[in-house]
């Protein structure tokens, strides 16, 4: 199906009970569903002859700490045959376990591991759900908005112990806010010169 409007109608008619909302923007179709329907909707998008979304481009998360359902899951699919993209989303609570797409798209394996590592979202039936980007024993999930800028621990090589060690972060000074006016900005004589030029014109 080459037309996004036709594709939107097709998906809404075929998956009536599984679609919460659809919208076309930026030449892409956005589909909002519930977590429970991710497997059925993904299978339809991949196998239906009029959709053929046979490539999973990415799995990622948006963190909204102020929301009751903190995380929004985002899946990006591509149909090479029809040159179309679909963005599939649903919201979940902080400690909710969600279905893995590895049985449908093996490429989801590392993408879901990255989401687990960076945000702490767990996937049911994932074949190897462990950290992929951070070090062994890493504390926390770095892309959550409540993760401290300095991290929880510092990993460094100790000359004394001749090995890599991990220890709590020690800040030598309190956090300082360097948001102040530069001496090169807003000087009085420049402001006066601009005002004088405005009066002349």
Predicted regions and their residues:
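Terminal low-complexity/charged segments
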Residues: 1-201
